[in-house]
Amino acid sequence: MINDETQDKDLQEEQKAMPADAKVLLDKVHTAVPAPPPGDEWVAEAVKAVEASITKLIDEFRAQPFIHRVEHSLHARLMQLLSEWEHLRGWYPIDDSGFKTQLIHKEWPETRPRKKEPERIVDRRRGSFDVAILAPSQLEKATLEQFTVGRIDAPIVIELGLGYWNDHLASDRDKLKNSDVQHPYLVHLSRMPSGYQEKTELIIAGIEAPTQIAYVHHNLEQKKVSVRYLGSPEIVPI
């Protein structure tokens, strides 16, 4: 969810990412295309590409935290890195509609609507994932209507944030858990001084599988960098 020093979105505003042609179909699409079964070979290969792309982005931000001024630019760079992988390239047929689409998508609807506080009532509106990867086998089964409204359960999802702290990180974590994503990733980047760093890093320490997290924090005043790579059990000062 985009939420950095210059931008903020709540759940209602996220709905603006929904294309106009999807809104008229919401009440007509009642089923979703499920994610491929665990162990799917295509997904396993895609995971390798995704994790390598995230690691490259982390390395870039660790070395040069001001290459990108805002989070939108980081999203664009991540999409670029993902698209460099042959496994994730190309256009694939959407069932027998005669139309094709790509596998990497921005602002893909959440698999399951979240519950709103304080009533804990399920909100019919859905927020969006920052980046989602669909499998070709899913597109083969999806109707054009299911694709248009985003009713395809993405097996790989990435939430990327710049310059926010514990509350939003916890929200992104819960978003991924609520949608029961097969391969969920959090990318948490910061270059701001904050009294919330300790709380944020406690949340990071408590991230549980299947969610994986990559983290970089630049303490510009003290010229220190804290990093946690995907698969690493701890944050390492550099």
Regions found by a protein language model. Give the residues of each.
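Charged, often low-complexity linker/regulatory segments
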Residues: I2-S83
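A non-catalytic, helix-rich entry segment at domain boundaries
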Residues: F66, L81-W85, G90-Y92, S97, ...
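Active-site metal-binding core of divalent-cation-utilizing nuclease and nuclease-like domains
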Residues: Y92-R151
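A domain-level signal for the structural core that forms small-molecule/cofactor-binding pockets
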Residues: K116-E117, I152, I156, A170-R173, ...
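Catalytic core segments in nucleotide and nucleic-acid processing enzymes
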Residues: I133-K141, R151-L162, R173-N178
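Active-site-adjacent loop/helix micro-motif of nuclease/hydrolase catalytic cores
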Residues: E140-L144, G163-K175, G195-K199
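Nucleic-acid nuclease catalytic cores
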Residues: D180-T211
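Non-catalytic C-terminal interaction segments of nucleic acid-processing enzymes
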Residues: G206-I238
